[in-house]
Amino acid sequence: MSALLRLLRTGAPAAACLRLGTSAGTGSRRAMALYHTEERGQPCSQNYRLFFKNVTGHYISPFHDIPLKVNSKEENGIPMKKARNDEYENLFNMIVEIPRWTNAKMEIATKEPMNPIKQYVKDGKLRYVANIFPYKGYIWNYGTLPQTWEDPHEKDKSTNCFGDNDPIDVCEIGSKILSCGEVIHVKILGILALIDEGETDWKLIAINANDPEASKFHDIDDVKKFKPGYLEATLNWFRLYKVPDGKPENQFAFNGEFKNKAFALEVIKSTHQCWKALLMKKCNGGAINCTNVQISDSPFRCTQEEARSLVESVSSSPNKESNEEEQVWHFLGK
């Protein structure tokens, strides 16, 4: 545990508002050959947006147009590194929203056309997650699986709570610090059922399929074996992270037990079905923006020219009023 605490205390410089880049190792080079990002506005400002393009340079929605699962057709013959044949069927695309050790709460803008990544704004202010001793920012590379949706009108059969109206979240536990906007391939290991203000907010535990240690990880027990203390720290982080903002501790289904890979895959399957209903206009999506360019039978599909017009309507001018959160440590005693 002492080794884990030393690791968690090692954070990025306070001035690093947002880590951006196009590559962070073998897996990222492969993924970024398929997807690219384009910034508009200035990081750490309310007008900042990070849009996505496919390999041909056309704008896409990361929420809707990036496939949930990795497959040979999508990869165009690019070989996987160290992936076992029986695991290849369970490789998923993950969109990285928040690099490990950073505080800016970046998220896919589900209610905006083309769903760029932006920084979450609450009460007119940019949202930053607090540093709770001994942690620094997010303690994993944090992001989401595309083509998933936790339906706010449907009770989860496991938690008996409605969904949180977002794609399913992922905590990537690999050895590399990734970049906002990267699309990587991950192996699913398990899942945690967070109940956030009465809503189901699943947290997948996964590892980059091209991480140097990925071959050792196949299920949730491998996390306990090879990264002792990490799951306990994850549970504690999610329990406390809203307390500095004056909110109560979060609760969990299953008494905070991490469920295994098989359970996690069923949850992913369910959220993917909810997303399909959303894109086919078979359920109430509310304010969710379903504009896409690649889902052929979706009534929300638009042309490449229309997608370009939507992106170009967003201001690309730098905002001089960028703001970085003051870095303080919160000590929460019991």
From Swiss-Prot:
Residues that hold Mg(2+) 2 according to the record: 169
Keyword set includes tRNA processing: no
Tissue: Detected in brain, gastric carcinoma, lung, ovary, skeletal muscle, umbilical cord blood and a cell line derived from kidney proximal tubule epithelium.
Residue numbers bearing the N6-succinyllysine modification: 216, 259
Xref: Pfam families: Pyrophosphatase
GO molecular function terms listed in the Swiss-Prot or TrEMBL record: inorganic diphosphate phosphatase activity; magnesium ion binding; protein serine/threonine phosphatase activity
Family annotation (CDD domains): pyrophosphatase
Cell location: Mitochondrion
Listed GO biological process terms: diphosphate metabolic process; phosphate-containing compound metabolic process; regulation of mitochondrial membrane potential
Main location: mitochondrion
Keyword Mitochondrion attributed: yes
Assigned protein family: Belongs to the PPase family.
Disease field: Sudden cardiac failure, alcohol-induced: An autosomal recessive disease characterized by sudden death due to unexpected cardiac arrest following ingestion of small amounts of alcohol.
Record protein name field: Inorganic pyrophosphatase 2, mitochondrial
Native source organism of the sequence: Homo sapiens (Human)
